[in-house]
A protein has these predicted regions:
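Interfacial helix-loop-helix hairpins and adjacent transmembrane helices
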Residues: 242-287
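Helix-loop junctions and hydrophobic alpha-helical segments within the transmembrane domains
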Residues: 179-201
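Alpha-helical membrane-protein architecture signal
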Residues: 70, 74, 78, 107, ...
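Membrane-water interface of transmembrane alpha-helices in multipass transporters/channels
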Residues: 105-115, 134-156, 216-231, 244
Length: 287
């Protein structure tokens, strides 16, 4: 086994063996040239687990062999998040679709909301790879280029989806209220954006400032989280919510509120209660 392992590219030095007190267990340690995030080291772990260990111990009864260490642990964590990411996305997207479908009694609005949220998330992921994996701004931000930590995309996706969906529902609620009062969709969009723009901008500015502080810290993982969330909120608040959302609402017009006939049984839901227009000042009494 040692000959085959040491023959792999990236291995260095002879192994060290330690036996347990009862002589039933042995720990054999090998040294690899790269760090735990080195892709070559992950390939070595995969090959040892897939080929070398089964070929060496597979025919021996009552013998268990395990491959551990920093590189093996990192590989297991990466594989865990890779397997779980589709399930997380399916749950978040599916639940968001159902809630928006019931809230706005439209099948177009939830589809459009999910696509817009995925757009801002994808843009954030692209910038994250450009800066941290490709090394752009590495000197300015004070880090060494390397792979994105495996849990960072999952955290960014879930946190950003919650924040952006909150902004989205806030805007759409005001648009729907204006439309329910009889305004055409185009005018309702303009009124909804005018009412919510100040609140959305202020909330986004606060979140961007908070996340940007994370980028100044020394830990690369925190830098990645802060940068990804700050850029995502910036894109979401300035481009997606302020430009793409109202543009698509005006282009689709009344199609925004289309609901198939077989879903007309859905209940009417009021998200934030009825908000009436300000009442007129009472006129002074006259004799």
């Amino acid at each position: 086994m040692s000959k085959r392992i040491l023959a792999l590219e990236g291995m260095s030095g002879p192994p060290q063996t330690r036996m347990s007190v009862d002589g039933k267990d042995a720990l054999v340690s090998y040294v690899m040239a790269g760090g735990r995030n080195d892709e070559r080291n992950r390939d070595i772990v995969r090959e040892v687990r897939r080929d070398i260990v089964p070929a060496t111990f597979g025919a021996l009864p009552d013998v268990n062999a395990y491959v551990t260490g920093d590189a093996a642990f990192t590989l297991d964590v990466v594989d865990f998040y890779a397997r779980g990411m589709p399930q997380v996305m399916a749950f978040v997207l599916g639940l968001s679709f159902l809630l928006l479908l019931v809230a706005f009694r439209s099948i177009v609005i939830p589809i459009k909301a999910i696509l817009l949220n995925l757009l801002s998330t994808g843009a954030a992921f692209g910038l994250l790879v450009l800066v941290f994996q490709d090394g752009r701004l590495a000197d300015q931000l004070g880090f060494k280029a390397g792979p994105i930590e495996s849990f960072v995309p999952v955290f960014i996706f879930t946190i950003l989806f919650g924040l952006s969906m909150d902004y989205h529902v806030f805007i759409l609620t005001r648009i729907k209220e204006a439309r329910d009062r009889g305004l055409p969709t185009g005018e309702a969009v303009a009124r909804g954006i005018a009412i919510t723009s100040g609140t959305i901008t202020s909330a986004a500015a606060i979140m961007i400032t908070v996340f940007a502080v994370f980028v100044t810290l020394d830990l690369v993982i925190i830098k990645q989280l802060g940068f990804g969330l700050a850029t995502a909120v910036l894109i979401d608040a300035t481009i997606v919510r302020s430009m793409l959302l109202p543009a698509t609402m005006r282009l689709l017009g009344e199609w925004n509120w289309w609901l198939p006939s077989f879903l007309r049984w859905l209940p009417e839901v009021t998200i934030e209660g009825d908000i009436d227009e300000p009442a007129a000042e009472p006129a002074p009494a006259t004799a």
